[in-house]
Amino acid sequence: MRHCIIFIVCISIVEIRTVHIEFIKEIVVIFRIVDHFSPFMLPCLLSHCKDGDTIIFVCQSVMKVRNISLWNKLVLVRHCVLLCAFLLSFFNVLHSIISICRIF
């Protein structure tokens, strides 16, 4: 079964605002993976998040994607930006590993 990936940027925990795509590259990326997302999980997820966190929801059906987008609180980002975010996260992790290796 194909999975739909939704990329969500939390600017404020109180009110999730939409973000212009060009701002995403400046956000420190923190990924939290949810296999089976339902709208009831959002308050629980937000209680563990900080302002500026990045969440990726992996949904099993397009219908769930449509249900989430109806809230008008979440921003859906194109796959190319999602790829850039993954690469940014990868290089940040790689840089951290190299920095730790230099210490030892």
UniProtKB/Swiss-Prot annotation:
One of its GO terms (biological process) is protein targeting to vacuole. Keywords: Membrane, Transmembrane, Transmembrane helix. It is found in: Membrane. Disruption phenotype: Causes a vacuolar protein sorting defect. It comes from the Eukaryota. Partially overlaps SFH1. Disruption phenotypes caused by deletion of this gene may also be a result of a defect in its overlapping gene. GO terms for cellular component: membrane. The chain crosses the membrane at residues 4-24, 80-100. It is a multi-pass membrane protein. The gene is VPS65. This is Putative uncharacterized protein VPS65.
